[in-house]
A protein has these predicted regions:
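Extracellular/periplasmic, surface-exposed regions of secreted and cell-surface proteins
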Residues: 1-226
Length: 226
């Protein structure tokens, strides 16, 4: 067996501060290419057990050879912006698109935006009198989408595998259907929404989180019997 993977990631960042405003922006892209191949040959009934190590042809009961070749490509582009005002109001926005060779051309790319915001309530002026009790208090919320392409290659087209069938005293090579193709396959998408409250009491001797979230997945990628 042989496997080769090539990965290239490039990012460009910009950060600046003006007064109580802080901004950080990042742009990037990533390329991933994977290739694997395998070859299998076997034989049995050698005159001596050691012969098969050096020469498979010395056996008298050869097995059917097997070989495979597989390659996948993934390209991603992403952008992220983070804004912070006075360490009280925080905002993050992200947009990424991913393209996978595992899907047909018309469904190759998926778009996955996300955003999150947070308010450090404990930094507000009206919380000063309570600081001895409430050390930290932050309200946060987020919404976003993420993609999944964890399926085998070429599932959008029908796959055949080699086989042999008996014809009298001989075997004839043939092809049989392994899976039925689905050209409508596309990125599985999980939509996540979250709201939470983080708190710390008595100089953070006591801390905790109250959180509510909801995840919903659509366009599930799975194998079903027909």
């Amino acid at each position: 067996d042989e496997k080769f993977q090539w990965q290239n990631t490039n990012t460009l960042s910009y950060a600046d501060s003006f007064g109580k405003h802080h901004l950080n922006v990042m742009l990037g892209n990533e390329l991933v290419f994977t290739q694997s191949r395998s070859l299998k040959a076997a034989n049995n009934q050698f005159p001596d057990d050691n012969f098969g190590i050096y020469d498979l042809s010395l056996g008298s009961l050869p097995q059917k050879p097997e070989s495979s070749f597989d390659e996948t490509g993934l390209v991603s582009y992403f952008a992220r912006a983070f804004y912070n005002f006075d360490d009280r109001y925080l905002l993050t926005m992200t947009l990424r698109t991913d393209g996978s060779s595992k899907f047909a051309k018309e469904n190759r790319f998926g778009w996955f935006p996300s955003a999150s915001a947070a308010w450090r309530i404990s930094e507000e002026e009206f919380m000063k009198p309570l600081q001895r009790v409430i050390s930290s208090l932050k309200l946060r919320a987020s919404y976003g989408q993420s993609g999944n392409n964890r399926i085998g290659n070429n599932r959008y087209s029908s796959i055949f595998e080699s086989n042999w069938y008996a014809n009298g005293s001989s075997e004839i090579p043939s092809l049989i259907s392994k899976t039925l193709g689905n050209p409508g396959l596309k990125w599985e998408t999980t939509v996540s929404a979250n709201i939470g409250l983080d708190f710390g009491l008595f100089n953070n001797r006591i801390s905790g989180t109250v959180e509510v979230y909801k995840n919903k997945t659509k366009d599930l990628l799975l194998t079903a019997d027909v």
